């Protein structure tokens, strides 16, 4: 089957590696004071691609944890995708120039779709769109506001734009270890041609196994945060399952 990627997540707040519950900045748990060391740990465990979010940047609308991100880029060799506060071409270009493999555009995908299309055209394969849904509607501004449009409506705007991936997060499950909302994620993936990455709620090895079933074949992979930090998913077991599925 196609290669499924399990992305370990590092969320940055005040230069530290944290996890939030349902995107609430007041419900943050610090997991590592040194994000670069956490990134190195994930690489040493065998992960192939790192997912990083500048939480402060998502709220501020511009990068707030650049120092921590740059330290990670100097520490690991695996590709890094980054979201949070990327709302104009200058910011996007600066991150790509610094070595970010793929940038994730969230709020601006709702507010300024022309920017996403221009960026994807200019940087093929390096621009992803992050769609974070609350009750089916896309949330913006670090999830502080909910728009009136659905994830599918937004995704369809970019069907022919060259967007590398859609990262779909179910806010209701994020950080709560309730399991992925695979039904909604697969429904989105089946309705568009852009690869979709599942996010929010991945809780156990069973969620990883579900990603490897035929019905999830259009998913590029999934992002895991709290389940890895809490030890609910054994990296070696998860990566071995994925490796076996690739060879099948």
Curated annotation (Swiss-Prot):
Pathway: Amino-acid biosynthesis; L-histidine biosynthesis; L-histidine from 5-phospho-alpha-D-ribose 1-diphosphate: step 4/9. The keyword Amino-acid biosynthesis applies. One of its GO terms (biological process) is L-histidine biosynthetic process. Pfam families: His_biosynth (PF00977). Its EC number is 5.3.1.16. InterPro entries: Aldolase_TIM, His_biosynth, HisA_bact_arch, Isoase_HisA-like, Isoase_HisA-like_bact, RibuloseP-bd_barrel. The active site is at residues 11, 132. It comes from Afipia carboxidovorans (strain ATCC 49405 / DSM 1227 / KCTC 32145 / OM5) (Oligotropha carboxidovorans). One of its GO terms (cellular component) is cytoplasm. It is found in: Cytoplasm. Belongs to the HisA/HisF family. PANTHER family: 1-(5-PHOSPHORIBOSYL)-5-[(5-PHOSPHORIBOSYLAMINO)METHYLIDENEAMINO] IMIDAZOLE-4-CARBOXAMIDE ISOMERASE. It catalyses: 1-(5-phospho-beta-D-ribosyl)-5-[(5-phospho-beta-D-ribosylamino)methylideneamino]imidazole-4-carboxamide = 5-[(5-phospho-1-deoxy-D-ribulos-1-ylimino)methylamino]-1-(5-phospho-beta-D-ribosyl)imidazole-4-carboxamide. Keywords: Amino-acid biosynthesis, Cytoplasm, Histidine biosynthesis, Isomerase. GO terms for molecular function: 1-(5-phosphoribosyl)-5-[(5-phosphoribosylamino)methylideneamino]imidazole-4-carboxamide isomerase activity. This is 1-(5-phosphoribosyl)-5-[(5-phosphoribosylamino)methylideneamino] imidazole-4-carboxamide isomerase.
